[in-house]
Amino acid sequence: MTEPNDTGPALQAEHLGKVYDEGPARIEVLSDVSLSVARGEMVAIVGASGSGKSTLLHILGLLDVPSSGTVSVDGVPAAGLSEKRKSALRNRSLGFVYQFHHLLPEFSALDNVAMPLIVRRENRDRARAQAREVLELVGLAAREEHFPGQLSGGERQRVALARALVTRPACVLADEPTGNLDRHTAHNMFELLTRVNRESGTAFVIVTHDPELAARADRQLHMENGRLQPD
């Protein structure tokens, strides 16, 4: 597998298409979508439900394959990679944050954050040390031994963000990261996302319905009928 290239875009997609054949019907979900995300850039993608935003995020995250077009992550083209190598690229160079935190309830905040490194068979002590660093970055150093059930909704989402950052990815893909939070907590999450983006130099691609969060991004793009265009 080609080694990551830290001088080019964190994430690049060219002429993506996605088509589902359902019986006699042919459903085009994405049409000729191209996107280049610079290192350290925050890009917001907005659009109505069903416009193709989540499908695009899944393809950018190497969780789905396009019907046409190419994706490169950290300078590495995904086309032609085996599932094992694609998984390794995803785990090394991408982080994910979802509307629901998906934390493991039986593990502490610290061990939830360290989990991506432990799965990669990193030394456990080193993984926990790295997890402590990112928990401090998101303001939860004092809560590392608490379990998800002992944390507020906003704290759980911050743990999820720390987990996405612990591998030091080139890019974090966030799908409605504030969608399950109340207005005040969502505002605090906006502040955290922009600060982490600035301080860590990690690129972010954020799918959101929230105009306030989208307005904080370096660039806003609008998805409509499977096509991506400047907002």
Curated annotation (Swiss-Prot):
Belongs to the ABC transporter superfamily. Lipoprotein translocase (TC 3.A.1.125) family. The gene is lolD. The complex is composed of two ATP-binding proteins (LolD) and two transmembrane proteins (LolC and LolE). Keywords: ATP-binding, Cell inner membrane, Cell membrane, Membrane, Nucleotide-binding, Translocase, Transport. Residues 11-231 form the ABC transporter domain. The lineage of its organism: Bacteria, Pseudomonadati, Pseudomonadota, Betaproteobacteria, Burkholderiales. It is a peripheral membrane protein. GO terms for molecular function: ATP binding; ATP hydrolysis activity; transmembrane transporter activity. This is Lipoprotein-releasing system ATP-binding protein LolD. Its main location: membrane. ATP binds at residues 47-54. Part of the ABC transporter complex LolCDE involved in the translocation of mature outer membrane-directed lipoproteins, from the inner membrane to the periplasmic chaperone, LolA. Responsible for the formation of the LolA-lipoprotein complex in an ATP-dependent manner.
